[in-house]
Amino acid sequence: MRIVFVRHGEPDYSKDSLTEKGWREAELLAKRISKWKVEEFYCSPLGRAKDTASCTLKAMGREAVILPWIREFSYHIDDPVTKRHSIPWDFVPSYWTKESLMYDIDGWTQADVMKQNPIIESAYKDVCQNFDKLLASYGYIRENNFYRMPGKKERFVAGTVSKDGSPFADHDDDSLSEPTIVIFCHLGVICVVLSHLLNIPFPLLVHGFFLPTTSLTIVSSEEHWSNEAYFRVQAIGDVHHLLNGKEPISSAGSFVKAFQG
């Protein structure tokens, strides 16, 4: 199974829509995605995500399933250092890196700054539980920190290279027909889902990775042993469609100008 997360185009937050540049990004994105075989499209209920999706959906004559729980993870806190009242990330390094709970996959919601807003803990659990329900509809059942596919043909492949050192070529042809789903959503909630899939604390992901607008984050399920699966990131923040279309990469959401190479 392949999951493609799409961050919305450059946002006009005052209108919960896109800037003119954001619409150009969305059109270039549509040209890229419309070449794919997509099992299902899913989308956040927020306007900037729906507007981004609209270009692809129109090009393909498709509709998206709206998932209320994949909205942005914008549950506000009061930053103890900068005093801003805003999203629960973008903390200064000297503050968040000394908080041991920020490195705890099960405990980061209990850090003092996160506990300011009790919705953060329940919202995180809600996203994780609903994402597991979505995966279960495709046959992936959460078991502790990985997924199992009951009834699926078992495979036993111990490595990615053969005994002679050549790349392992005997990949199951069935993998070519496995579903690809596309989810139009937001930087923060993408990091929430990746936190759950990869068992990495949310603060490490959201402070460590920048996902440009209309970027693709591609995650595939690796099913090489028995009927067990673990999700692995193939690409994160990919914007080849913008570079190929000579559209500059937006720095929206970053404290540094995005590299244009």
Model feature map: region roles:
Residues 30-118, 261:
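Phosphate-coordination/substrate-recognition cap region in phosphate-metabolizing enzymes
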Residues 6, 67-69, 236:
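Conserved beta-strand termini and adjacent loop/short-helix elements that scaffold enzyme active sites
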Residues 18-33:
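Short catalytic helix/loop segments, enriched in acidic residues and glycine
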Residues 1-4:
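Extreme N-terminal starter segment of soluble prokaryotic enzymes
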Residues 9, 187, 237-239:
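Active-site metal-binding loops of divalent metal-dependent hydrolases
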Residues 73-91, 149-180, 192-261:
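Acidic, low-complexity terminal tails and accessory targeting/binding regions
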Residues 113-168:
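Internal catalytic-core helix/loop-beta-alpha segment
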Residues 7-20:
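Glycine-rich N-terminal loop/short-helix segment of MobA-like nucleotidyltransferase
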